[in-house]
A protein has these predicted regions:
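Structured, beta-strand-rich domain cores
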Residues: 67-143
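Short, charge-rich amphipathic segments
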Residues: 3-8, 12, 28-34, 83, ...
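Membrane-targeting and insertion segments and their boundary/processing signals
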Residues: 48-55, 137
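Mixed-charge, glycine-accented linear interaction segment located at domain edges/termini
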Residues: 144-223
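Generic hydrophobic, helix-prone segments enriched in Leu/Val/Ile
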Residues: 19-25, 29-32, 46, 115, ...
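Oligomerization/assembly interface segments of phage tail-like spikes and tubes
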Residues: 51-52, 58-90, 155-170
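Polar/acidic, low-complexity leader/linker segments enriched in S/T/G and N/D
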Residues: 1-51
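Extracellular/lumenal ectodomain signal focusing on beta-strand-rich modules
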Residues: 44-48, 139, 162
Length: 223
């Protein structure tokens, strides 16, 4: 029988950082339901993605003078995106529209979008080079955000934009719908991970796109 041990060399894991963010705007007209998103575009200047899941709260039911059971509420995925800038393609997701070259207006309908970003996994031997996780988020909708413009002074700071993002889950065969999928590079075969990244980030022949969970699972589970 195995004896438990703690903090062995190589097992001291941690997570940090966020980078390689990609925006996938929703298509105006979806022809193929398995490919509802437009080509991805790189999101430069990302500083933070703060995941804020909610729900999954118990409601106690009592009967016969005892606690009968707990009913769990549905869980939802939400996040806050923080960045120094954003791709031009995000403007329609943020409620802006162009009325002429160089002129935009706000308070317009907000387009849904998908998102991918990477977080780093480190350990005591390889530091931040141990691995990473790719996060895929579906059915995102950004809420209006505050922008604080201040005078330039002797302590210059760049404005950090921030958006509250809600999500709508998508179907996953054999499971409940989800809006958040995570791929762990330390557990997925290298060849399959490369194939997935070619889909997400594009190749010389194909535009980057956001695959739905069923396609990701089929790719990773396939031979």
């Amino acid at each position: 029988m195995a004896v438990l041990s703690w903090d062995q060399t190589g097992d001291r894991l941690y997570e940090t950082g966020t980078d390689q963010c990609v925006l996938y705007p929703m298509l105006d007209t979806v022809v193929d339901v398995t490919k509802p998103y437009d080509a991805g575009v790189a999101w430069n200047g990302l500083t933070a993605v703060n995941e804020r899941p909610s729900g999954a709260e118990p409601t106690a039911l009592w009967a016969d003078n005892i606690k009968y059971l707990n009913l769990m509420s549905a869980e939802e995925f939400a996040a806050t995106i923080e960045a120094y800038t954003y791709p031009e393609e995000f403007e329609v997701c943020d409620g802006s529209r162009s009325v002429a070259t160089g002129i935009t207006i706000g308070q317009q309908p907000r387009k849904m979008f998908g998102l991918s970003y990477r977080t780093l996994v480190g350990n005591d031997q390889k530091s931040n080079d141990y691995g990473y996780k790719i996060h895929l988020v579906y059915g995102c909708l950004a809420s209006p955000s505050q922008k604080n413009y201040q005078t330039v002074n002797d302590s210059p700071e760049a404005i950090t934009f921030s958006w509250e993002v809600s999500s709508t889950p998508v179907d996953v065969s054999g499971f409940k719908p989800t809006a958040h999928l995570i791929i762990d590079s330390t557990k997925v075969a290298a060849a399959k991970l490369t194939a997935l990244k070619e889909i997400l980030y594009g190749t010389a022949q194909n535009d980057p796109r956001l695959p739905l969970p069923n396609e990701v699972a089929t790719l990773v589970n396939g031979n």
